[in-house]
């Protein structure tokens, strides 16, 4: 999908096959990488910039009017910390939810099971390992809330 434009009907058709109920107002720039596609739910007017990776072993839900910067990675798969448990070929997945009117900066990583509230800003390059409440700005590795708007 790297050579296709966001305005290319072929590319849009492929996305609509891959992601059920993809709103006509939402844009996913190529290249875009995902595990399955059917675990991704986007609201209206969502913008996903180039070179993002969504590993959707569990649901990834992104609210309306949210902006996703380039090279953002959203992961739902999780593996055990214990090395003996990792020898079993098991993979667990935990859903990721991003609220409405959020801005996820370029290169951010959203880890399994995380919920980011409405109207949040996640700084570029941040690694979000825990939930972020509504109306907050979070930055860093691991991401920490540095400001709340309300």
Language-model features, listed with the residues they occupy:
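Residues that flank catalytic or metal-binding motifs in active/ligand-binding sites
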Residues: 70, 124, 134
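Beta-rich strand-turn-strand
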Residues: 105-131
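Short glycine-centered segments of the SAM/dcSAM-binding site in methyltransferase folds
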Residues: 65, 119, 137
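Acidic, glycine-centered active-site loop in nucleotide-sugar glycosyltransferases
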Residues: 133-134, 139-142
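Terminal amphipathic alpha-helical/low-complexity segments used for targeting or macromolecular assembly
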Residues: 1-25, 143-146
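Generic structural signal for beta-strand residues in well-ordered domains
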Residues: 19-21, 67, 89, 129
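Flexible, glycine/small-residue-enriched loop-and-beta-strand segment within the central core
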Residues: 32-42, 47-115, 141-150
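Conserved short histidine dyad/triad with adjacent acidic residue
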Residues: 27-29
């Amino acid at each position: 999908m790297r050579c296709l434009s966001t305005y290319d009907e072929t590319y849009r058709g492929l996305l609509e096959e891959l992601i059920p109920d993809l709103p006509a107002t939402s844009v996913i720039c190529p290249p875009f990488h995902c595990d399955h596609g059917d675990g991704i739910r986007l609201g209206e007017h969502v913008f996903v910039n180039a070179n993002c990776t969504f590993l959707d072993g569990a649901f990834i839900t992104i609210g309306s009017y949210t902006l996703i910067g380039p090279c953002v990675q959203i992961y739902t798969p999780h593996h055990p910390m214990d090395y003996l448990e990792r020898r079993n070929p098991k993979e667990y997945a935990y859903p990721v939810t991003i609220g409405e009117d959020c801005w996820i900066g370029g290169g951010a990583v959203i880890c399994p099971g995380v919920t980011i509230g409405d109207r949040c800003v996640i700084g570029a390059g941040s690694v979000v390992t825990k939930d972020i409440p509504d109306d907050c700005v979070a930055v860093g590795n691991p991401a920490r809330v540095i400001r709340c708007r309300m």
